[in-house]
Swiss-Prot record:
Keywords: DNA-binding, Transcription, Transcription regulation. GO terms for biological process: regulation of DNA-templated transcription. The gene is ytfH. It comes from Escherichia coli (strain K12). Pfam families: HxlR. This is Uncharacterized HTH-type transcriptional regulator YtfH. InterPro entries: HTH_HxlR, WH-like_DNA-bd_sf, WH_DNA-bd_sf. Residues 20-118 form the HTH hxlR-type domain. PANTHER family: HTH-TYPE TRANSCRIPTIONAL REGULATOR YODB, TRANSCRIPTIONAL REGULATOR, MARR FAMILY. PROSITE patterns: HTH_HXLR. GO terms for molecular function: DNA binding; DNA-binding transcription factor activity. The keyword NAD does not apply. Disulfide bonds: none annotated.
């Protein structure tokens, strides 16, 4: 059995390898706010302030950081209009549409199965 070098693993991608770049992408996509941003943008283009209102509990700082990470990964388009006050819009790229479909399916599954999950949680806490 041959050993696969770290550089080969990084080239091919191996989520279980400590240094694999896919882990950083996974962190951005599956973060608390990343999932909600991707699901919210499935409805279409949103301004920063719209996203902040829509995603309850997110701070301005965390929303900005999460949007920036998703944009850097190629999942979001960001358009800043040169007006006062600032007007910035976010939308999904084709890659973002693909990943948002996956996380939306996970979010749907969670919502559908939440009563059972909560019942098991309560049962095990007792």
């Amino acid at each position: 059995m041959s050993q696969v070098s770290l550089s080969q693993q990084l080239k091919e991608g191996n989520l279980f390898a400590e240094q694999c770049p896919s882990r950083e992408v996974l962190k951005h996509v599956t973060s608390r706010w990343g999932v909600l941003i991707l699901v919210a943008l499935r409805e279409g283009t949103h301004r920063f302030s719209d996203l902040r209102r829509k995603i309850g509990g997110v701070s301005e700082k965390m929303l900005a950081q999460s949007l920036q990470a998703l944009e850097q990964d190629g999942f979001l388009n960001r358009i800043a209009y040169p007006v006062v006050p600032p007007h910035v819009e976010y939308s999904l790229t084709p890659l973002g549409e693909q990943v948002s479909e996956k996380v939306a399916a996970l979010a749907d599954w969670i919502e559908l199965n939440l009563p059972e999950v909560l019942a098991v949680r309560d049962e095990r806490a007792a």
